Amino acid sequence: MQKKITTNITIISCLGLLFYSCSTTKKVPEGEYLFVKNKFIYDKEDPDIKKKKTIINKDLSDYVKQKPAGKFLGFFPLWQWVYNWSPAKFDETFQEYYRQDASVRNQKLLDSLLTKNNLSEYVGHSLWKERLYYSQGEAPVLLDEQQSEFSAKNLNRLFHDKGYFDSKVAVSYDKDSVAKKAETIYDIKLGEPSYIETYDQKISDQKIEEYLNSPIGKQTVLHAGDQYNFDKFEEERDRIIDLLKNRGYYDFNDSGEDLYFEADTLKSNKRLDVTMFIDKYIQDSLKTDSITPFTQYRFGKINIYADSRSFVDDESKLIKEEYKDYNVLYTKEPEYRPRYFTDAFVIRPGQLYRQRQEIQTKRNIFKKENINLHGFRINKQDSILNVDVFFTPKKKYDLNLFVESYASRYMNFAISPGMTLTSRNLFGGGENLETTLKGTLGSVNKDFSMNKAFLNAYEIAIETKLKFPYLLTPINLDNILPKRFTAESAIRMNASTQKNVGLDKTTYGFGFDMDISSSEFQHKVSLFNTEFISNRKKDRYYEVFTKDNNTKNEIKDLYYAYNPNAPIYVTDDELTDAIEADKGFQSSLTGEDAKLYVDFENMLYRKANISQNVLINSFIYQFTFNQENSFRPKSNPWFIQARIELAGNVLRGLDKAFGFNKAEPDREGNQAGLIFGIPYSQFVKFDVDVRRKFKLNSNSSVAGRFLFGIIQPYGNSDVAPFVRSYSAGGANDVRGWAPLTLGPGSKPRIDSKNQSLEFESMKLLFNAEYRFNLFGSLEGAYFLDAGNIWGVNKNRPETLFKFKDFYREFGIGSGLGFRYHIGTFAIVRFDLGYKIYDPSYELGDRWQFDNFNLLKPRIHFGINYPF
């Protein structure tokens, strides 16, 4: 422990020396100051200042122009240090060099600039290190008083928008001429706010006036007595525009002049008479303004060009098919039935224009896998909107090649090449057949395999999925399912086989899925979800899981010491069965030996789960609510996903009706029903995953997650299948632990190099992350994770969830991470996790601060955010 403390102190000391030895003012010119901070000071004598700050509710640093340079992980000015590593004499040369286009930056350009700046002795040198420091570092931010004055005016505009018309912002500076650093201080006096005395509406169009005075239309956010707030005026404007654009007023306020507010301040600038105006001015030939009613539009013709090449001047040359009032046009014999296109359309000929329906139509089109949207044109003709939509079909066949790689505690290295072949439009309605073939070659850790060859394991997997862009149901649901929902169905089959991976599984699967989704909601149902898993090498269990083998051998030694005349059993299973049946031996164990026997029973439970052959036939329903997909994405979006799975009930009914073959009775005399010699699983499983993100400012956010899951076997099953059980630890879990090594509950710790796999029937997990931009596409994060797994089997009381104690059994981990954004959608993640609170220790020793070692984090790699 002393060594760990010394190591941590050494690391912290080195960081401290680095901090003080790398001056951030090294390149600050004489008479200038390094700008280090903006400070905002409100009037302390104002008795209502707390309330006023709450009303403003803004990060003031977003409204000032000059900001201090960023700091690595929020603490270290790393990029300023890197910039200063480049000698100052090269600054002017490098500034001119990087001002040029990248295509002309070469040694010739660099040499000419060095000569120009009297640095001829460096001609011919690439200066790559110095250029790297200069280009990747960050130049010092110098105090700019003009920018500070501009920022003060910007702050005043903010306060004015919040109703403080008499606000005053005074700028001063705290300059340290010795350190060459300065702070800008903004002294803020808000004064008294202004209020809306009266609120009135003047609307020139009678139809719009009647609508805005209806129960829906008059739900205004502006009221007499409210404090003036410009944000509320914008909210009210957007509300009215949204209402009218969804009542046929296609081009309402597109000019920005149809709706406006006026505030009368003649009586007092503290009590305002506010009026909202809606009117449409046009100019006649004499350029005289006159008011005219707004046009309410309906859809006319909707022309769907199935191939963008079909847009020709002479439409008589096209094959035209009318389907449900839509015109579908082709250049040749149709490959797709008209319904494939029209299913996406929420807008219909003759309907009143509604902006939401236009947006939903485009979203539905973008979900179509076989076509690209080439154009969406709306043409006004009096009060009619004619629509032309152009599509480009994708290729009939598409081959996608991919390669994946990974490493784990079990597998030193694995590479997985694969390919997916897509055959589009099999039956003319947009049906696709996807076939994926994937192979894996890997090197199993020597602790888990007797085969010492480098590539000593493989897996081959194939999956076929037939996808339908509609619901496969006995009845037609077109008139029941709203158009804002898109529907899909899929029939899937898969098979895989392993060699020298675990117990060498062979897996077969089949399922029928239906998916109904809108912008925020998704309902997914899996019927006849069937999985068959066969472990071909069950006898290798103790070779693979060496910790369990050690436990078995220790109990074996105790058993033969207790009963020297016991027979020598041929198999390990015969031995463990005999030990389980010997109550006299069990009652003879005390102290550490009794604890060892509990570990032995847990090992047998684990072995039964992992090595069992499994047949699952289940029904699954999953509900997802995701505000990040809404029409107007929220700044603090929610994500909620709930899932329930019911397995074995159909087979149980058939078993009772027809009488399946039965397994040998267990110790309680129960006999499981068999199909092809395998007990079918019967259980109910429920999960809920709740997440929320909070945007703090343009560069940082906080994200949190709560996850709960439970599985309860019953009927034909005593234990839950391993593939449906819960584990804790890993890159998306409690990151201070490796996968499957945390828990269950407060199970005593063992040698981490010999850790058994841990899984159970119940899970609780909490995660929190503070995410912030470092520079460019690189993001940093601090995280805190807490969670564990527990059992629900009363025959194993040491693993049970206990309401009065569960919070003491949370594993708590923390750490920092880096995320690099590749393009728009992909993120490469690297996390360093540390154990903070370890429930495997005795109660008084669970906090791990004394054992904390900065040099030994748990390292995790991942793709995209963990939640």
Regions found by a protein language model. Name each.
Residues 137, 141-152, 226-237, 330-334, ...:
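Solvent-exposed, acidic/flexible segments
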Residues 401, 433-437, 491-493, 640-644, ...:
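Membrane-embedded beta-strand positions of outer-membrane beta-barrel proteins
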Residues 44, 188-192, 203-205, 276-282, ...:
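Flexible glycine-/small-residue-rich
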Residues 406-410, 527-533, 538-772, 782-786, ...:
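C-terminal outer-membrane beta-barrel translocator/porin domains of Gram-negative envelope proteins
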